[in-house]
Regions:
Chain D
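Iron-sulfur-associated redox domains of electron-transfer enzymes in respiratory
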Residues: 1-166
C-alpha cells in the first residue's frame, strides 16, 4: 500500500567517501570502482576516495564538502564503526551536519581483510555501500543525552593492581571503595619473598602501600567481601557487596592476637591457606603479620564454638575490647559508583593435571608458590629450605612451563614463570647452597634488566637444561640415584636423554583465569577471551577498557602479567576512570527506543521485555512509555511491538528495511 | 545384574590359563552373569596391526560384530586383546574408509557391524560396575601381611587411559587393598616388561623384565601382581635366564584375580595358583593363606 | 433532477458475508439506497457484464469489491470495474489480503484439484473428469474461467483507492466510508478506513492483561472454559488483537472468542504474522530449546493461525512448492 | 571458467558479540567466503522476524542471525527473546517451503573470530548446494498467469483510443 512511498520523494543529498586505508583496503578492493559506482547511485551528490579518510585532511575534505555541496547525509566506507564511527560523526558535525546523519560502511575488517578474490570483495563493498546510502536517507537528526557521572569508584580485587589503582584514584581526591574477597589485601604478591629481577623484598615494597590503603581518608576497605550484584550504566552503577562474617568486630579489633594464643587449640592444627598448607593455623587466625586490615577472623569450618556452640570461648575472654561476636551474620551493602576497576587477578595451574611430575605422590615435589613461602623469612620455615621430611635438599630441579605452552593443558606462555624460576633458583641456592637445575623450553627474559638477571644466574653456577621434563620418578637406576627424585629429560642442546637426580622438584606453574572468572564477567557484563581471561576492548588501543563503558580491567585478570606491567596497567585503568569522572558527565548513544503515544494500543507486550525496567505502563493514559535514560538501546521492544509503535533511533524499521533492500538490490 | 560377554583370546586359553581360571572363578563368586563369546577368533595381537592394518581390523572386527548381535559389553582380560579391540573399535568409528572395507569383509561372512560394542577391562568392570563395596563384603579371608607390587603394564593405559590414570594407575591397588594386601608404591607400574623382545632381542627384553622384578623386590614386595598375561609370562617365565644373566630375584608373579579369589576364600586349586613357575606358596603362606 | 451518484458492488472469491454486511446496515441501507444509484450488485440485482461495459469509463463513482482474486473471470470483472469506476474500494479481508481463500496459497493448484475431483471421500467421479476452461458441445464452444495457482488480493491485480478491513467490515466503518464518499471528503489514496491503533486499545479485557505473560503453554478455544473477563492471551489463547488493527470494537473478544486478526495489521507493520510472532513469543517462559519447542507445539498450524486472513499479503505470498 | 552459483546471504550481527567477532576475524586476517552481507544491530533481539522474511523476499538465498551465547547477552536476555521468536519463525518458514539451512541462528562470542569464518563458510557451502531461492524471480513467474489477460484489457483500451482518434 504505502510501501516505499518515500522513494518517490526527492532524495536528500548524500556524500559518499571511501578510504584506501593505505593499502589495507585498496589492495583487496577496487576503491575507484566503488567510488564511481556510488557516484551514480540515486541521491549521491558527492563521491570521493582518499588514502586515509580518518586523517585530518580526510576529515577536512568531508567538512568542506558538506558546506560547499550542501550535503544532507554522510556515508564513509572504511574500517569498523567500532574504531572510527565517532571520528566521522565529529567530521560531520564540523561541517555543520548533525552527526547522526551519518552511516559507516565496514569494508576493511568485514571485506578487504577477510577475502582473497578482489572481484568479489569489490562487489561486496558495492553492496554494502549501496545499502548504507539507501539507509542513511531515513536517518534523523539526534542529540546525545548527557548524564552526570558519580565521582566515586569501586575497585574489585586487592592485589597489587587493585592497591595501586585505589591509591592512584584516592590521591586524585576520589572516594574509592576497595573490595577484596580474602581477609587481607596484598594478593599473590604478599606471599612472595623477593621480586625479580631486582630481588627487593616483596613485603618491604608492598606493605607500605597496603597500610597506605588502610589509612587513606578517601579509601573504604572492605575485605572478606564480594560483589554480588551490579546494576545501572556508565557513570551510574549501583553495586551490591556481600560482607562475609569474621565473627570479630572489625572496628574493635586491634590485631593484638592475644585471642589466638588463648584459643582452646593450644597448637595450630589446620592447614593455613596463606602458606599454601605448608604451615598450620588455629580456628582464630590472621593470615600473616602484615595482614591489612590487621584484624583476626574465625573460621567457621574449624571453630568449635561455631561448629558445636560448645566452647568456653577463651578467645573472646582474652579480648579486652570485646571484639568477638559469634552471632555475626553476612551483611549486604549497596554502593553508588561512576566507574569500576576490576583487578581480580589469577589462579595458578593445578599440578594434579600433570601427574607425570608426581606432585602429591612424592613429598619432595613442590609448586612454585609453596617454595615462595618456603624461602620467605616470614614463612612457615622462616626462610629455611627444609623439605617435608625435614631434610635439606642438596640438589633441586626447577621445571618450567608446567601448565604453559602445552597443547594438553594451556597453550599460552604464562610470561612470568621463566623469571620467577630464575628468582627461586637464586633464592634456593642462596638459602640452601644446593645445586639448582632449571629445565626450560625457551628462556624468556624480555623485560628491563631481565636478560641481565639471567646472565647473573648463569654466573652463579645454576644449571640450565633445555628440554621439557618427561617424568619425575623415584626409581633409581644407579646407586647415585638411590633415594633421589630423578628427572628424565631430553637435553635438546646436547641431543640425548638425561636423568638428573635431585632431592627437591619445583614445578613452575603457569597462570590461569580465576575459577569464577566467567561468573564475575557476567556480573559486570564484560567479555572473556577464549582462554578465559577478561577481554579488553582493543588489544592495542584500549587494553584496560572493556566493552562496557565505565568498567576497566587491570593486572593478571586480563592476561598473565608480572608486577611492573600490572602496576603500569593499574595506573592506566585508574587514569581511564579519572578521565571519565573528571569529565563530569557521559554522553549516551542516542540509539534508544521511544513509543509513539498516539500509535500505542497499550497491549503491554514491551513492558516485561526491557531488562532495565526502562519501559513502564502509564495507568492513566493506558499506554506504555520509555525512560530514555534507562534505555540502553538494544531494540528488543521495537522488534516486539505488535503494532509497530516503537521506534529505535538509528535502527528504525525503515532504516533496516532499506539496508536489507540495499545489500540485495542489484 | 548386568550381563557380559567374555573374550578370552589365545593367552587365557594357553600360557595365561591361570588368569582365565581365577577370573572366571571370581566372576562366579561375585555372581556375575558372564558368558564366553561364541566362535571368537584371534584378536590379531599388537603385531599384526603394523603388518596388515586393514586385515587386522577386519580380524578383530569379526569379534566385535559377533558381540554386537548380543548387544552386551565385552570383557577382554588380556591387555593385548583389550587394546587391539579398542583400537579397532576406534578406527571403525573414526575412519570411514577402513569401516567401509571392514564392514564389506564382514558382510561377505554374513556379519555386520554398526559400532555399538563396548570393550572393557576386568578392572574397569570390578571397580565401576560391581563396586569395591560389594567386593569388600565378599572378602572372607583377607590376605593380611601380603605385600604386593601392582604392575599394570603398558597396554591398558596407553594410548587410551579410559578408566585409570595414565601415569599412576590405581584401580588394581584399590582391589588389592580391599583384599587385605599391602601395596608398595613404585613408579614402574606401567613401565615396559620387555614384551615380545624377550623372544626377539633377549638381551634387551630380559633387562627390562629384570628392572621391574628388581625394583619390586627392592621396594619390599613379596610378589608382583599383574593383569596382563604377557607381562606375567615375561616376569615369571624368564626368571631363570635373568638369574643366570643378572641375579636371582625369585619373585612370584600373580594375577590380581588370583589374589582376589584367595581373599574371597576360593581354593587355590580353582585359581591356578600352582601354575606359576616361581612358586607363590611361600609368600602366600606368609600371608597366612591355605 | 440530477441523477444520483452511481455505485457498484461486486464479489469475487468470498463467502457472501461481505454482502451480508451491507444488508446489516439495516435501516441505514435505505439512506444509502436513497442517496445512490446501484448499477451493479450480483447478489441482489440482475445486471449483466454488457450493462457495465456499455457505461462510459469513470461513470461510476465507486466500486465496492469484496473477495479474493483467484479466477480469470474475477480478474476480467475487476479490471472492467477499475475502468468504469472513479474510486475502487477494496471491501473486506479477502479483497484486502486474500482472506480465508488465500489459505489455499499453502497448496499447489494441482493438489487442490486432485483432492476435490479425485480423492475427496464424498466425490463420485469415476472418470476422474476435471472441469475444462473450454469445451465444444454440438458445435458451440463453452468456456469456464481459469483457476489461478495463486490466490491474490485485489490490489495485487488492480489499483485500489481505499480499503475497508474486516471479515466482514462492520456496519459502522462501512457507513463512515459511504458517507465520506458521498460528502467527497476523501482521505489520501491508499488509506485503510479504520483506526491505526491495535485492537487492545478498544478491548474491554485490556485492563486484565498482565504485563508479563510468561506463557508456558498455548491452548485452543475448544480446550478451555474461557473466562469472559480476563485477557485472552493471559488465558493462553492465541489472540491476535495486539497485532491487529482496531475498528471492530473488539467484537470477538466481546463474544468470548480470541481475535483472529481479520482487520489486518496497522500500516506500520508489513507482515502481520511475523510481527505477532515477534511480540508474543519474545515473552514465553522457557529458555531451553526443547522447552520452547514444547510451548510452540501448542500451535499446530502456525500459518493458518497467524495468517488466517492475510497470506496473499504476507511477505512470502504463498508456499514455494 | 565454470560459473558456480554464489548464494547471497544476509547476516544480522549483534554489535557486542558477533559483529565484534567479525571484526576480530578481520584483524586476525582469517579468510572466508565473500557471500555474506552484514547488517549491524545492537542486539540480536532487535531482529524482527519481518527482517528475515523481507531479506528472503528481496532475494536473499540465506539469512544468518548472530548473537551472544545464551547467558552472555550484553543486554542480559535479548538473545533468549531472539531464540524464542526464531524457533517459531523457523517452523513457519518450513511450512512456507523455506527449509532448514537457509535460515540459521548462531551464537558467536566476541572472541570467536574463527567461528565467524567457519559458520559463514559452512553456510555458504550448504546454501550453494541448496541452489538459488530467488523469491523476486518466483514472484514474477507467479504473476505471469495474470499478465495475458491484463495485456488483452490494456490492448482493448488502445483499440478504443484508436477509434476515437479516427
Amino acid at each position: 500500500m504505502t510501501e516505499n512511498k518515500s522513494k518517490k520523494e526527492t532524495l536528500p543529498r548524500v556524500g559518499f567517501y571511501i578510504c584506501h586505508c593505505g593499502s589495507n583496503i585498496a589492495s583487496m578492493i577496487d576503491v575507484l570502482e566503488v567510488q564511481k559506482y556510488a557516484a551514480a547511485l540515486p541521491g549521491v551528490a558527492v563521491s570521493r576516495e582518499y588514502k586515509y579518510m580518518c586523517s585530518d585532511p580526510g576529515q577536512e575534505m568531508i567538512a568542506k564538502d558538506i558546506k560547499e555541496h550542501k550535503l544532507e547525509r554522510l556515508v564513509v566506507a572504511a574500517c569498523s564503526p567500532n574504531l572510527h564511527e565517532e571520528t566521522f560523526r565529529k567530521a560531520a558535525a564540523k561541517g555543520g551536519l548533525n552527526p547522526f546523519f551519518f552511516q559507516m560502511v565496514n569494508i576493511r575488517e568485514h571485506a578487504a581483510w577477510v577475502h582473497e578474490d578482489k572481484k568479489s570483495a569489490t562487489e561486496k563493498a558495492k553492496d554494502l555501500a549501496r545499502a548504507a546510502i539507501a539507509r542513511v536517507r531515513f536517518h534523523k537528526s539526534l542529540d546525545k543525552k548527557r548524564v552526570a557521572v558519580d565521582p566515586n569508584v569501586l575497585v574489585v580485587g586487592g592485589g597489587i593492581a587493585g592497591i595501586h589503582a585505589a591509591l592512584t584514584l584516592a590521591n586524585a581526591g576520589k572516594k574509592v571503595t576497595l573490595v577484596e574477597r580474602e581477609a587481607t589485601i596484598g594478593g599473590h604478591m604478599a606471599a612472595f619473598d623477593k621480586t625479580f629481577p631486582t630481588l627487593d623484598c616483596a613485603a618491604c615494597i608492598l606493605t607500605p602501600k597496603m597500610s597506605a590503603v588502610k589509612s587513606h581518608p578517601n579509601i573504604t576497605l572492605w575485605t572478606y567481601s564480594e560483589v554480588s550484584k551490579v546494576e545501572g550504566y556508565v557513570g551510574n552503577y549501583k553495586v551490591t557487596v556481600t560482607r562475609k562474617p569474621r565473627f570479630v568486630k572489625e572496628d574493635l579489633c586491634v590485631g593484638c592476637m592475644e585471642c589466638i594464643d588463648a584459643c582452646v587449640f593450644k597448637e595450630p592444627k589446620f592447614k593455613d591457606k596463606f602458606n599454601q598448607g605448608l604451615g598450620k593455623r588455629k580456628p582464630v587466625y590472621i593470615d600473616f603479620p602484615q595482614a591489612t586490615p590487621k584484624v583476626v577472623l574465625v573460621d567457621p569450618e574449624t571453630c568449635i564454638q561455631l561448629k558445636t556452640g560448645k566452647c568456653k570461648q577463651p578467645c573472646a575472654a582474652a579480648c579486652d575490647r570485646k571484639a568477638f561476636d559469634f552471632n555475626q551474620k553476612a551483611e549486604t551493602k549497596e554502593l553508588q559508583v561512576g566507574a569500576i576497576v576490576l583487578s581480580t587477578g589469577f589462579k595458578t595451574y593445578d599440578v594434579a593435571r600433570s601427574p607425570q611430575y608426581g606432585y602429591g605422590r612424592y613429598p619432595g615435589v613442590y609448586t612454585a608458590l609453596e617454595v615462595e613461602r618456603l624461602v620467605n623469612a616470614s614463612g612457615p620455615t622462616s626462610g629455611e629450605v627444609v623439605l617435608r621430611d625435614g631434610t635439606h635438599p642438596k640438589a633441586v630441579g626447577i621445571i618450567h612451563c608446567v601448565g604453559s605452552r602445552d597443547a594438553k593443558t594451556n597453550k599460552w606462555c604464562s610470561r612470568v614463570c621463566c623469571m620467577y624460576s630464575l628468582k627461586l633458583a637464586h633464592l634456593i641456592k642462596e638459602h640452601s647452597g644446593a645445586e639448582v637445575y632449571n629445565f626450560y623450553i625457551d628462556m624468556r627474559a624480555p623485560g628491563k634488566a631481565y636478560e641481565e638477571f639471567y646472565d647473573k644466574l648463569l654466573g652463579e653456577g645454576v644449571h640450565f637444561i633445555r628440554g621439557r621434563v618427561d617424568e619425575v620418578t623415584d626409581w633409581a637406576m644407579t646407586p647415585e640415584e638411590e633415594g633421589k627424585l630423578v628427572l628424565r629429560v631430553e637435553d635438546t642442546l646436547a641431543g640425548f636423554v638425561r636423568r638428573i637426580p635431585v632431592d627437591m622438584v619445583v614445578l613452575s606453574t603457569g597462570l590461569e583465569p580465576q575459577p569464577d572468572a566467567q561468573e564475575v564477567r557476567r556480573r559486570f557484563n564484560i567479555g572473556c577471551g577464549s582462554e578465559g581471561f577478561f577481554q579488553e576492548r582493543h588489544p592495542k588501543l584500549a587494553p584496560v577498557n572493556t566493552f562496557t563503558d565505565g568498567i576497566y580491567i587491570a593486572g593478571a585478570c586480563q592476561a598473565p602479567r608480572d608486577i611492573p606491567d600490572t602496576v603500569a596497567q593499574a595506573g592506566a585503568a585508574a587514569a581511564e576512570a579519572l578521565s571519565l569522572i573528571d569529565a563530569g558527565f557521559v554522553e549516551l548513544e542516542p540509539n534508544t527506543s521511544h513509543i509513539v503515544e498516539e500509535e500505542c494500543s497499550g497491549c503491554k507486550t514491551c513492558v516485561p521485555l526491557c531488562p532495565y525496567s526502562a519501559i513502564t505502563f502509564d495507568e492513566a493514559k493506558k499506554k506504555a512509555t520509555i525512560n530514555e535514560v534507562l534505555c540502553k538501546g538494544c531494540g528488543v521492544c521495537a522488534a516486539a511491538c505488535p503494532s509497530g509503535s516503537i521506534r529505535q533511533n538509528l535502527f528504525e524499521d525503515d532504516e533496516i528495511f532499506s539496508e536489507i533492500e540495499g545489500v540485495l538490490a542489484k | 545384574m548386568k550381563k557380559y560377554l567374555y573374550f578370552p583370546g589365545c593367552s587365557l586359553k594357553g600360557s595365561g590359563k591361570a588368569y582365565e581360571e581365577s577370573f572366571l572363578a571370581v566372576c562366579k563368586a561375585l555372581g556375575m552373569d558372564i558368558r564366553e563369546l561364541e566362535d571368537w577368533n584371534c584378536c590379531g595381537a599388537t603385531a599384526y596391526m603394523s603388518v596388515e592394518e586393514t586385515k587386522s581390523y577386519a580380524l578383530a572386527g569379526r569379534n566385535l560384530a559377533i558381540a554386537e548381535r548380543e548387544d552386551l559389553d565385552v570383557i577382554a582380560p588380556c591387555s593385548a586383546c583389550y587394546l587391539v579391540l579398542n583400537k579397532t573399535q576406534k578406527a571403525l568409528k573414526e575412519n570411514t574408509e577402513i569401516r567401509r572395507k571392514v564392514v564389506n569383509a564382514l558382510k561377505a561372512g554374513g556379519l555386520d557391524y554398526k559400532g555399538t560394542v563396548k570393550v572393557r577391562h576386568p578392572l574397569d568392570v570390578l571397580i565401576n560396575d560391581v563396586g569395591l563395596e560389594k567386593i569388600s563384603k565378599l572378602i572372607k579371608n583377607p590376605v593380611k601381611g601380603l605385600k604386593l607390587a601392582p604392575y599394570y603394564g603398558c597396554q591398558i593405559v596407553r594410548p587410551y587411559a579410559t578408566f585409570d590414570d595414565q601415569h599412576d594407575p590405581v584401580t588394581m591397588d584399590k582391589l588389592m587393598k580391599a583384599a587385605g594386601a599391602e601395596c608398595v608404591t613404585w613408579p614402574l607400574k606401567t613401565r615396559c616388561c620387555g614384551g615380545s623382545l624377550t623372544g626377539t632381542v633377549p638381551e634387551v627384553g630380559l633387562r627390562l623384565a629384570y628392572i621391574i622384578l628388581k625394583e619390586a623386590k627392592k621396594r619390599g614386595a613379596g610378589a608382583i601382581v599383574t593383569l596382563c598375561p604377557l607381562c606375567q609370562f615375561n616376569l615369571d617365565g624368564y626368571q631363570g635366564k635373568i638369574a643366570s644373566k643378572y641375579e636371582s630375584v625369585d619373585m612370584p608373579v600373580l594375577y590380581f584375580t588370583q589374589v582376589l579369589g584367595l581373599a574371597m576364600g576360593l581354593p587355590g586349586s580353582e585359581l591356578g595358583i600352582k601354575r606359576g613357575i616361581i612358586s607363590a606358596e611361600a609368600v602366600l603362606a606368609g600371608g597366612g593363606l591355605r | 433532477m440530477p441523477d444520483k451518484p452511481k455505485v457498484a458492488f461486486y464479489w469475487c472469491a468470498s463467502c457472501g458475508g461481505c454482502e451480508e454486511a451491507v444488508v446489516d446496515l439495516a435501516e441505514d441501507i435505505l439512506k444509502v439506497v436513497a442517496a445512490v444509484d446501484i448499477v451493479l450488485w450480483p447478489v441482489a440485482m440482475d445486471f449483466k457484464k454488457e450493462d457495465v461495459e456499455a457505461r462510459p469509463d469513470k461513470s461510476i463513482v465507486a466500486g465496492f469489491i469484496n473477495g479474493a482474486i483467484r479466477t480469470s473471470e474475477q480478474e476480467e470483472w475487476v479490471r472492467l470495474l477499475r475502468k468504469k469506476c472513479q474510486v475502487i474500494v477494496s471491501f473486506g479481508a479477502c479483497a484486502n489480503s486474500g482472506g480465508i481463500p488465500a489459505l489455499a496459497n499453502q497448496f499447489q493448484k494441482e493438489s487442490i484439484l486432485k483432492y476435490v475431483y479425485d480423492d475427496c471421500p464424498s466425490i463420485d467421479n469415476p472418470g476422474k473428469i476435471r472441469p475444462q476452461t473450454e469445451c465444444v458441445d454440438e458445435g458451440r464452444t463453452l468456456t469456464l474461467p481459469e483457476l489461478r495457482n495463486v490466490v491474490r488480493s485485489l490490489d495485487q491485480v488492480i489499483d485500489v483507492d481505499y480499503y475497508l478491513p474486516g471479515c466482514p467490515p462492520t456496519p459502522k466503518i462501512i457507513m463512515n466510508a459511504v458517507l465520506a464518499l458521498l460528502s467527497g471528503k476523501l482521505p489520501p489514496k491508499g488509506t485503510v478506513l479504520s483506526p491505526e491503533i491495535a485492537l487492545c486499545e478498544e478491548c474491554k479485557r485490556k485492563d486484565s492483561k498482565p504485563a508479563d505473560l510468561a506463557l508456558t503453554e498455548f491452548k485452543r478455544p475448544h480446550q478451555v472454559l474461557i473466562d469472559p473477563e480476563k485477557c485472552l492471551l493471559a488465558q493462553g489463547l492465541v489472540c491476535m488483537g495486539p497485532a491487529t488493527r482496531g475498528g471492530c470494537e473488539a467484537l470477538c473478544p466481546g463474544g468470548n472468542m480470541p481475535c483472529t486478526g481479520c482487520f489486518g495489521p496497522t500500516t506500520r507493520v508489513k507482515d502481520q504474522g511475523a510481527k505477532f510472532v515477534s511480540s508474543v513469543f519474545s515473552n514465553i517462559a522457557p529458555k531451553e530449546e526443547a522447552e520452547i519447542d514444547a510451548v510452540l507445539d501448542g500451535i499446530p498450524d502456525p500459518i493458518g493461525t497467524f495468517y488466517r486472513y492475510g497470506l496473499s499479503k504476507s511477505m512470502l505470498r504463498r508456499k514455494l512448492n | 571458467m565454470s560459473e558456480q552459483f554464489e548464494p547471497k546471504i544476509v547476516a544480522f550481527f549483534c554489535n557486542w558479540c558477533t559483529y565484534t567477532a567479525a571484526d576480530l576475524a578481520g584483524v586476525s586476517r582469517l579468510k572466508y567466503a565473500p557471500n555474506a552481507r552484514v547488517i549491524r544491530v545492537m542486539c540480536s533481539g532487535r531482529v524482527d522476524p519481518q527482517f528475515v522474511l523481507d531479506a528472503f523476499a528481496k532475494g536473499a538465498d540465506g539469512v544468518l542471525l548472530g548473537g551472544c551465547h545464551p547467558g552472555d547477552c550484553h543486554y542480559a536476555e535479548g538473545n533468549y527473546k531472539t531464540l524464542r521468536r526464531m524457533r517459531m519463525l523457523t517452523r513457519m518458514l518450513k511450512d512456507m517451503g523455506i527449509y532448514d539451512g537457509r535460515f540459521r541462528l548462531e551464537w558467536i562470542s566476541g572472541a570467536e573470530g574463527d567461528k565467524v569464518k567457519s559458520v559463514i563458510n559452512d553456510m555458504t557451502k550448504k546454501v550453494r548446494a541448496l541452489g538459488p531461492l530467488d523469491l523476486p524471480g518466483k514472484f514474477k513467474n507467479w504473476d505471469k498467469e495474470i499478465e495475458e489477460l491484463e495485456a488483452q484489457v490494456n490492448k482493448g483500451d488502445k483499440d478504443k483510443e484508436a477509434v476515437h482518434a479516427g
